Design a protein with these regions (language model features):
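Residue-level signal for well-ordered, solvent-exposed loop/turn and beta-edge residues enriched
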Residues: 6, 134-135, 281, 296
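Internal "kinase-insert"/substrate-recognition segments embedded within catalytic cores
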Residues: 3-109, 117, 206
Length: 301
């Protein structure tokens, strides 16, 4: 951007997260909700908390829709209670009644593919179409891409495994396998063409007018603030392609290791085994119950 001939930097203009009847956040105008899980809640005039995040991290929820000035007390009470019920359902395995599993699975799969090392703080949005029992809690949009490619190749994103960041750790480690199964299903659908699609998209940017403009802006940027020029746009694009080449095959191995328990048979036994519970934790003094042995469900009594 130039102002009166003076270069001021390179900016990306994008639409903010808001209700829009023509896009993925098409919540009902009178009874819909869009809220942000927000570590900077204290900057807002209105916010609310739920049980899962009322801990040391102190995350709160802030309003995207309705606007905070228009929120009625009964609306705040409703969405607070619904999210509290959702959080409890994730812990007890009944989450299928509360969340849109596909949208949650797509959200975390995208960040796993991108190797995001953040994505668990601010800019994390959920929506509910209306205040009826028929609508579920959704994750309609991805956000926060400044930490992509920072995980080691093959590693899941930070938000995947960190129980304090969001709900995903508990969704993957759950007696209800619906979430893990959907996640793996989505991965299998895109895996065959994913690398070629990403590669073609990256190369299309470097060869475009947009890419050439970025290259020019890069040099202007470094000249303005005295930085030493780093790689060209083409070199950065090749680095990204190389990273995906290294990352996706290893990620596939780790995804295949996720337990969805879809083909487990049950047997009864009184024999002594090293056993694991359904969350994959080794049990040193087994009690009566259901355990896993060599991918088989064992009823221990």
């Amino acid at each position: 951007m130039f102002i009166n001939g003076d270069y001021r930097g390179c900016y990306l203009l994008i639409e903010s997260v808001k209700r829009n009847k023509d896009c993925r956040i098409n919540v009902d105008k009178t009874s819909g909700y869009i809220v942000e899980r927000d570590p900077y809640w204290w900057k807002e005039n209105r916010f609310f908390t739920t049980n899962y995040f009322a801990s040391s991290k102190g995350y709160r929820w802030t309003w995207k829709y309705p606007d905070e000035d228009d929120v009625l007390l009964e609306q705040e009470d409703y969405i607070t209670q619904f999210i509290n019920d959702t959080e409890q359902s994730i812990l007890n395995g009944t989450y299928s009644n509360y969340i849109d599993i596909k949208s949650f699975a797509k959200w975390i799969l995208a960040h796993d593919i991108l190797g995001s090392k953040d994505s668990g703080g601010t800019n994390l949005y959920v929506a509910k179409y209306d205040d009826t029992p028929n609508s579920l809690l959704e994750m309609p949009v991805l956000w926060d891409f400044d930490s992509n490619f920072r995980m080691e190749p093959g590693e899941f994103s930070k938000c995947h495994n960190n129980a304090g960041d969001f709900y995903f750790y508990n969704l993957f480690n759950n007696t209800n396998n619906s979430f893990t199964s959907k996640y793996k299903e989505l991965w299998l659908q895109i895996k065959p063409t994913l690398l070629s699609t990403i590669t073609q998209y990256i190369l299309s940017i470097t060869d475009s007018e947009y890419g050439r403009a970025l290259e020019s802006s890069r040099m202007l940027h470094y000249n303005r603030w005295g930085y030493t020029p780093y790689e060209t746009i083409g070199e950065l694009a090749q680095e990204a392609i190389n990273w995906f080449n290294n990352h996706l095959d290893k990620l596939d191995v780790n995804i295949n290791k996720l337990a969805d328990n879809t083909s487990i048979s049950a047997i009864k036994t009184k024999e002594k085994y090293d056993v694991y519970n359904l969350l994959g934790n080794k049990v040193y003094k087994p009690k009566k119950g259901i355990y896993i042995k060599n991918k088989r469900k064992i009823i221990y009594h």
